[in-house]
Amino acid sequence: MLKKVLLSGVKPTGAPHIGNYFGAMKQFVDLQKEYQGYVFIADYHALNFIQDKKEMEKNILGVLLDYLAIGLDPEKITMFKQSDISEHTELAWIFDTITTMPYLKRAHAFKDAEVKNKEICVGTFNYPMLMAADILLYSPDVVPVGLDQKQHVEYARDTAEKFNRIFGETFELPEPMIMKEVAVVPGTDGRKMSKSYNNHIPLFAEYEEIKKRVMGIVTDSGEGIPKNVYAIHKLFRNEDELKKIYKEKEGKYKELKETLIEDMEKFIAPMREKRKEFAKDIPKALEILKAGNKRAKEIASKKMKEVKDKIGVNIN
């Protein structure tokens, strides 16, 4: 029986933290067992806020190494780079021609930029159409998203329906896979973990950095069980075991943090070492991306030919 198709994109925005892992990255690894997956590095989307050659190159390679290190299997998941598949921007332009400005003004990213009084670039305004192209080229059954990202898939569905209505049935309508059960990981200060708050713990951190970050977790001196420590700790150990440990060491914050450090190190170390191994042979890692690009190109070019036939530009 053919597996259903799953697609997702990852913006190359820098080194991931454990919040990124438990909030999204881990799910891709889990889902690869039951889906035919496509995961692309969304480097053109990243151009809206990264306009430095060296940073972009470093981040793109970083995403590739990160996902290989956490267990993404190139035999099960096609990993490719958005900018290497020209059909993405080509289809986005075609979608632009059937999309109105008022419709794009409803996008969350545009509204956020307006509220912050930012100078809004055309890339930010137009990004829903590039995202629609990213999705619709591969006819996925599902697109994993958080509740706050559901609009991405809704834009793709609306665009597919409009194109189909104008030019005839061409695109399938993808379904959002709402990741309701994913963890919202607290940072070291109790707020949601984020690099912008500097309250994060890097996913591939060395032992000394893990120790420094965990020891810096904010605790309330009036608590018997430090809730910020516990909220992070339950990601790394069975909760029944944790309850016993936290009861035995109630009020002993330093000891509880030391236990978290050891549990976190046991979890992170294998992935950290695996990433180092991939980083020793960059050409080999790039071959994986090259193979993924080839597979993605075959699918995208086939769909693009169908689109061109429908809109009437294939006259030769």
Where are the regions a protein language model picked out?
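A generic secondary-structure signal for well-formed alpha-helical elements
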Residues: 64, 71, 99-102, 140, ...
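A generic structural motif
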Residues: 12, 143-144, 199
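Conserved nucleotide- and phosphate/pyrophosphate-binding catalytic cores
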Residues: 20, 151, 157-316
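N-terminal Rossmann-like or analogous alpha/beta NTP/dinucleotide-binding catalytic cores
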Residues: 2-133
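A short small-residue
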Residues: 41-47, 136-141, 274-279
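Internal, conserved structured core segments that host functional sites
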Residues: 109-163, 167
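Short helix-capping/linker segments at secondary-structure and domain boundaries
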Residues: 101-105, 137-144, 237-245
